[in-house]
Amino acid sequence: MESNLSAKGIFQHASANASGELFQEPVTEDLEKVMQSKGLYSMEELCSIIQEAYAPRVSVLCSRDADEFAMRKGYPKGFWELLYPFGDRIRGKVNRRGMNGEMLTLENLNLHFVPIDALESHLSEASFPSLRSVLCERYPGLVSPEPPSDYSFGVHYKNVERWAWTLAHEGNYQMPLPVYVRQLLTGIPITPFETFSHPVAHLVVVTSHNPSPFESLRSLINSIPYLSLPAFVFNDINYLFVYVHDEDQHDLELSMAIFDTMKQTFGDCGYFLRLHSQKATLDYEHTVPFPTSSWLSAEERLHLLSNTDTEIRLLFESDNESLRRLSSHIAFNGIVSYLDKCVRAWDDQYASPRRGITGKLLFASRKYLSSSNASTNSNYFPSSNAYRPFSPEAYLRKLADYSFMLRDYSHANQIYEIASRQYENDGACLYSAASLEMIVITEHILHLKMPYMSLTNTLRINEYMQSAMLNYLNKSFNSYYHAARCFLLLGQFLSCLPAPKVDDAANWNAGLLYSKRLGPVGRAMIFQQTHTLFKSLSYLKTESTDPFSNKRTRKAALWCVLTADAWLRCRIPFRAKPFVEEAKLFYGKIDWKDLKECVAALDEVEVSKQPASNIPSS
């Protein structure tokens, strides 16, 4: 059913009446409590989502025996599936000195384990053999000929919308926006202008079932350079290995001896993992449910929603503890130390020469003295929208992202500032937009405990936000996903401030809606959040005698109608009905023909769940 509310009619009637009182609930002076009670989340929650999303990626390369080991335990996607959920909120913590001298505590870290097949280039026009095919040709039987997992990078908007549309039809589900934001951030694609989806380490897995584990591990490690990655992805990165001991069938002392030999040969970057090869079932004691990752893709969540299999997957408690201990060791002993080493080395090599007066003079000389011959002095290739691999500019972005992963936001902010000036000078628009976006994000995270920015800083942040969106949207090579993400995150930051900038947040949300970067359900959720923002202000006591002073009551009513219209366009009338009824309280004294027709049509619509194939276009 299509709504009869036209945009023209809405804006004509929105300011026509200010006499109706829309809200009847008691007022309160605690804005934060009001916002949380109305379904809005806190700045801490938003920052936590971003910290978890922009976490290190670890690619997983498994031998054939490792994948078969996991399959026998009931995990058909191979050994990667066993590791997948244990990268969430890793237990333990470590203290690290930041680049500016302050002590940082790293805890509740995240790792995103991804199958190595998902990294191989689908972005390149040239056809290269996959690493798996190379290994099968050179070492028959070393790996499975077909990848056991179909995991892929990037957001598939149709699947995200199908997932949201399916949940929206659940009458007892409240459709919280943080869940949608998290789902959008699960699909960060592999691009040259940001490196969060680039792997920081390769994890190689072999088991005690391998007849020649030492030679197999050597072959797998030596084959990593043959990965067919895009040119902008650095393959010269850290590697780790895991030797899995079968507790049920093999001798522990023999496995320990083999593992010690591996460490002597390949370095102290290995981990010994003890697991049962038997499948855990309800018949066994000391079992726990297999955890579900909080960063499942939209495709995986759709599969869970449509899955009719009621079997509960279980793990032995000892296996669960071993996998948690393994992820903790990998995170703190392997990844954090490697990132810290890279940050300190690259900061001295690439960032230090660009700081201070010397750096400014060098930048000015490059900008003005070489402007006549910019194409030969720059490492940027406009034809491919990418910098030369291993160029200083490429390392600058990687340095900033690594600092962000280490939660050294002050240092990351400085590097993003340095990099953005360089990218703007080179005409690298997407690089510049991505750096400006991260400057805004790091500024808000840094001001989490200092919510009130200076006017100068606020104006600077607003300018960065505008520049980032112009670069994302107004270039011939604009990025559909990154524009949507930038609009969404900036609007959410403004919405979540302790003293929320409701009008600014509404403007960014309106820009996101106007750009049509989201599907119909996502747009309806943004309409609803903006309405809730304006509505939350109406509960606050003010000293003004004007009943509508700083309350945004009329704007709340306007966005209430827009929310109802958006849900009706999604053909989900039971979600639209409360907003229509709420709007009638405000506009009851106005003879609004369109609204009355909408309400009458709403009463005639049967609230039923439709198949996801019937999702309307926005």
Curated annotation (Swiss-Prot):
GO terms for biological process: intracellular protein transport; macroautophagy; meiotic cell cycle; vesicle-mediated transport. Keywords: ER-Golgi transport, Golgi apparatus, Meiosis, Transport. One of its GO terms (cellular component) is TRAPPIII protein complex. It comes from the Eukaryota. Its main location: Golgi. It is found in: Golgi apparatus, cis-Golgi network. Pfam families: TRAPPC-Trs85. Belongs to the TRS85 family. Component of the TRAPP I and TRAPP II complexes. TRAPP I plays a key role in the late stages of endoplasmic reticulum to Golgi traffic. TRAPP II seems to play a role in intra-Golgi transport. Has a role late in meiosis following DNA replication. Part of the multisubunit TRAPP (transport protein particle) complexes I and II. This is Transport protein particle subunit trs85-2. It comes from Schizosaccharomyces pombe (strain 972 / ATCC 24843) (Fission yeast).
